[in-house]
Amino acid sequence: QSVDQCFNNYHRLVDINLADEGRMLSGTPAILAEKLTKEYGHEVEAYSRVAYARQRPFDVYTNDEKKLPYTFECIEVDSFFNRLFTPTVVAGSWRVAAYTPNAVVITESTARKLFPYNQEAIGKRMVMTSKIWSSPKTTPDSGGISYTIQAVIKDIPANVSMNFMRTIEVLI
């Protein structure tokens, strides 16, 4: 299967990568998406910002409130991600995740590592133990940001443009 064909809208997706002096930037600024929509109007149906995948350490709290340290491959996404990339939700709600501050969505494989059943992941807490460099003004140096798992989605294949050949485990 070719890149991105796992998504329902693959034939209408456009991947924009930004570079500054030859260095790839890790995400797309909101202003660019707004500008593209304004300038190209009817040609842009929707947009979503996705930061490149990177590993992030978390403490995950289990059913009995045990704290377990894990490092997950994470991407930062906005609330429109599901409109373009059509992930299949197997537990919880994308809508709740999109409108809840500090919500995360985890993949089915990640849920299986942590809990006996996908549904048991919903409402559980994950605390990031390091800084998010794409949001330096809002992230404490030591991390400490608490997230709540609001949805579990089917695994995202490794052959997608947003994380080519890397296994995504958590969407922040």
Features from the language model and the residues they span:
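Aromatic-residue hotspot detector
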Residues: 1, 10, 43-44, 94-98, ...
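Membrane-proximal extracellular/periplasmic loop immediately following the first transmembrane helix
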Residues: 2-57, 68
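Short, flexible, glycine/charge-rich loop motifs used to bind or transfer phosphoryl groups or to couple energy/partner
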Residues: 3-6, 35-38, 91-95, 116-117, ...
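Generic alpha-helical secondary structure signal
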Residues: 9, 31, 76-80, 84
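Conserved beta-strand scaffold positions in the cores of enzyme catalytic domains, especially
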Residues: 13-15, 47, 74, 167-170
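Short acidic/polar micro-motifs at solvent-exposed secondary-structure junctions
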Residues: 18-25, 48-80, 90-104, 129-147
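Short charge-dense sequence patches
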Residues: 24-33, 60-65, 145, 152, ...
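Mid-to-C-terminal secondary-structure elements
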Residues: 78-91, 102-172
